[in-house]
């Protein structure tokens, strides 16, 4: 029998598109393939993966073992592969990933020259993402050996990134009950045996983030095993293991915490009923109760607000009122949470209006705060107005208790103040706050960032906001140089174009839009109205250039192709932007880079709406997230709901009861009723793929056809009895799929009696239809017309 240095075990399931790339990355390893044993375990794959396995088995019969078994999940496949492994070291690799050329060479060198049994490698995403793993801090400082009993914040739970000495795995097996996080449990058992691991930065494990989200991890939250089996059989097991190995307790608790924290605030519950949701919440809370506060507080690269929320969830109470000061630190249960001299005040709105400097800010690390914020200027302390609101953050315990973020507002006469510092008062002592400029603030955290308005120039330095009258051109040049040093190429380029074209471009542009790829909503009707009644207005309609409506709208007026350079320049020079939609790229087309351009973008934003708001959507469209300047409503009830729900943070100066511009179109034209039934269900957030960056489109969800939603509606429109009745009475159904689900359109069965569309002319549909059927979409309100 050949003595291999490494046995690579690869479970194979439904990966014919990726498998060859994985195999080749191993064959091409610099240590030579003759030193590698590859074990391909076909876990009942339904595609043509077997042909690829057999092809390479035939090419390398001495190196490759091919095993075929019934589907049992990745754990059973890895266990089966271990039975055949003869190499000195084991590598469990996923069948859609790849490794860098010297991956094994570098790993073997560290393993054989050091007294360790495990090394792990840096992770970089590829395919649908290009970033490093969110815990990349572990790989700062180069290659090293870490003693996990002393430095526990190096969680190792992504199995394919590890190279392990085989003798360490003698009696270990993967838990076949686990479909998700099986490697967390397995790797925890491994590290308590070795206690030291090698960290390798210079070679990479390339983790595929699939475009279609079809990998097990990407689709995990649509699987009940994710909610129940993983907490019960993986998390709880590891925390019990911590009791048996006291010197590894902090490591094991931290490893579980790194998985659990994302579940608390980034989890969808679309597949859970109310009882299941309650059970899941208690499972996660029970996990947190077994993790020491000290470990929660000590997390690396985690915002203080997340730590605060984890503790609140753990103890199921508002801990804001329970905090105590001890030696200039805020403490909970005698555990120091943060140093009061390091508190950060986040300024999310800063602008000038009517010669007043208006500042809105939040202290997002102390929820349910009883503390006041002061502005210090000219030797005096001015108290800010305080209000408590939900911050719009998704979390799994919204129904358990109010979870409120303190917001502060102040308006200052620019003639009276020149320098501003912010302080928090706690137990009769004031602490100076560090400032961070976010979201809609007209100045940002860059050195030389400035905001010029009405002859005033606002700058900041060393946590002091200054108001003066420096020459803006000189400051802007210094600011651009700062952007260059920070390698912020996109905002630098746009700012350069903005300044170059400034003398030649009008600065009173109005930009109107609906969806990025379709017209036909309130934006179009407002655009037409203005073109007819105010021909001097410098107005544009924004639309994707390949839209079916582009040529039609071009005949009405000037069109701005969305995402073109000209669109960005016009947007920066716009006086007003109005849209029936409020997706990020519409009211904030510069995305995360907008903070660098806010000082130059002076536009007001009007939200026209594309329907009637019947639910509380403050977490999505409230001031903290969208900061609109005018919010159009259709009815008194809707208007009152926006005004009276404090979490929107909009008052009567912003919310206006005018009706939607598209409403008038319902009474125009001579369209007659037809024998048409409009079937118009709303969408489900848990059943759609991720948004495609910079669009309103979503990726295809390969699990969609397994949902009750699909099976019900597809069963309805393909029901033979219904189709016979439609034929008998000469009726047709127009199935209007919500635009957010248009990627799934081809999943539904079509017939001569059922037409399926995702973005019809809604006004025409309402006028033509004899009957409209919906579930709980606000479109039902049209029935009252």
Regions found by a protein language model. Give the residues of each.
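Conserved catalytic-core segment of nucleotide-activated headgroup transferases in glycan assembly
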Residues: 246-247, 253, 519-531, 661-747
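Active-site and donor-binding regions of nucleotide-sugar-utilizing enzymes
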Residues: 359, 392, 499-501, 507-666
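Non-catalytic N-terminal targeting/anchoring module and adjacent flexible stem/linker
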Residues: 1-5, 30, 246-247, 251, ...
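A donor-sugar binding/catalytic signature common to diverse glycosyltransferases
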Residues: 607, 758-785
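Nucleotide-sugar donor-binding/catalytic module of glycosyltransferases
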Residues: 1-233, 237, 677, 782
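Catalytic binding pocket for nucleotide-activated donors in carbohydrate/polymer assembly enzymes
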Residues: 651-652, 746-751, 778-785
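Catalytic core of nucleotide-sugar-dependent glycosyltransferases
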Residues: 206-211, 218-246, 268-293
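Nucleotide-activated donor-binding/catalytic signature segment of Leloir-type glycosyltransferases, i.e.
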Residues: 60, 743-759
């Amino acid at each position: 029998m050949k003595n291999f240095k490494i046995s690579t075990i690869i479970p194979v399931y439904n990966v014919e598109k990726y498998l060859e790339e994985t195999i080749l990355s191993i064959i091409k390893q610099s240590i030579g393939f003759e030193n590698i044993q590859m074990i391909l375990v076909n876990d009942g794959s339904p595609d043509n993966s077997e042909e690829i396995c057999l092809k390479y088995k035939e090419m390398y019969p001495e190196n490759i073992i091919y095993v075929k078994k019934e589907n049992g999940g990745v754990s059973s496949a890895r266990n089966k592969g271990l039975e055949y492994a003869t190499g000195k070291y084991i590598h469990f690799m996923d069948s859609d990933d790849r490794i860098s050329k010297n991956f094994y060479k570098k790993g073997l060198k560290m393993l054989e020259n050091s007294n360790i049994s495990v090394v792990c490698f840096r992770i970089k995403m590829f395919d649908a993402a290009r970033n490093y793993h969110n815990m990349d801090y572990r790989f700062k400082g180069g290659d090293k050996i870490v003693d996990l009993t002393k430095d526990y914040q190096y969680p190792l739970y992504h199995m394919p990134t590890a190279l392990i000495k085989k003798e360490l795995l003698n009696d270990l097996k993967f838990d076949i009950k686990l479909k998700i996080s099986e490697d967390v449990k397995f790797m925890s058992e491994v590290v308590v045996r070795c206690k030291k691991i090698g960290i390798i930065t210079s070679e990479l494990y390339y983790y595929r983030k699939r475009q279609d989200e079809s990998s097990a991890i990407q689709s995990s939250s649509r699987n009940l095993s994710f909610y129940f089996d993983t907490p019960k059989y993986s998390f709880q097991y590891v925390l019990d293991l911590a009791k048996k190995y006291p010197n590894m307790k902090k490591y094991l608790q931290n490893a579980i915490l790194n998985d659990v924290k994302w579940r608390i605030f980034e989890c969808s519950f679309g597949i859970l009923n109310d009882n299941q949701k309650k059970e899941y919440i208690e499972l996660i809370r029970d996990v947190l109760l077994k993790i020491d506060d000290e470990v929660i507080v000590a997390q690396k690269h985690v915002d203080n607000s997340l730590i605060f929320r984890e503790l609140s969830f753990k103890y199921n109470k508002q801990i804001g009122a329970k905090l105590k000061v001890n030696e200039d630190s805020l403490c909970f249960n005698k555990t120091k949470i943060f140093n009061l001299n390091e508190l950060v005040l986040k300024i999310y709105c800063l602008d000038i209006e009517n010669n007043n400097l208006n500042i809105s800010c939040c202290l997002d690390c102390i929820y349910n705060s009883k503390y006041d914020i002061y502005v210090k200027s000219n030797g005096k302390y001015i108290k800010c107005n305080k209000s408590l609101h939900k911050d719009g953050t998704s979390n799994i315990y919204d129904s358990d208790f109010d979870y409120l973020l303190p917001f502060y507002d102040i308006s200052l006469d620019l003639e009276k103040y020149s320098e501003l510092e912010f302080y928090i008062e706690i137990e009769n002592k004031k602490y100076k706050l560090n400032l961070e400029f976010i979201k809609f603030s007209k100045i940002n955290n860059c050195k030389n960032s400035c905001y010029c308005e009405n002859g005033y120039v606002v700058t900041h330095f060393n946590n002091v906001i200054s108001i003066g009258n420096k020459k803006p051109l000189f400051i802007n040049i210094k600011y651009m140089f700062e952007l260059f040093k920070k390698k912020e190429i996109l905002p630098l380029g746009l700012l350069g174009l903005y300044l170059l074209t400034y003398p030649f471009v009008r600065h009173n542009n109005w930009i109107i839009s609906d969806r990025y790829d379709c017209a036909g909503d309130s934006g179009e009707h407002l655009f037409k109205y203005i073109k007819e009644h105010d021909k001097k207005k410098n107005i544009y309609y924004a639309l994707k250039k390949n839209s079916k409506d582009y040529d039609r709208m071009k005949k009405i007026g000037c069109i701005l192709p969305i995402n073109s350079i000209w669109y960005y320049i016009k947007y920066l020079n716009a006086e007003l932007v109005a849209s029936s939609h409020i997706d990020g790229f519409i009211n904030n087309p510069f995305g995360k880079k907008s903070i660098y351009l806010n000082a130059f973008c002076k536009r007001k934003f009007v939200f026209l709406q594309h329907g009637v708001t019947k639910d509380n959507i403050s977490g999505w469209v409230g001031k903290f997230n969208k900061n609109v300047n005018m919010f159009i409503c259709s009815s008194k009830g809707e208007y009152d709901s926006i005004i009276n729900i404090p979490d929107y943070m909009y008052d009567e100066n912003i919310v206006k009861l005018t009706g939607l511009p598209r409403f008038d179109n319902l009474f125009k034209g001579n369209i007659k009723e037809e024998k048409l039934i409009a079937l118009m269900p709303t969408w489900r957030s848990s059943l759609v793929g991720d948004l495609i960056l910079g669009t309103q489109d979503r990726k295809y969800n390969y699990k969609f056809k397994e949902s009750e939603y699909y099976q019900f509606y597809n069963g309805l429109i393909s029901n033979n009895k219904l189709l016979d009745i439609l034929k008998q009475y000469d009726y047709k159904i127009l199935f209007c799929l919500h635009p957010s689900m248009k990627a799934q359109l081809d999943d539904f069965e079509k017939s001569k009696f059922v037409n399926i569309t995702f973005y019809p002319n809604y006004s025409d549909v309402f006028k033509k239809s004899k009957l409209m059927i919906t579930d709980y979409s606000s479109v039902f309100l049209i029935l009252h017309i």
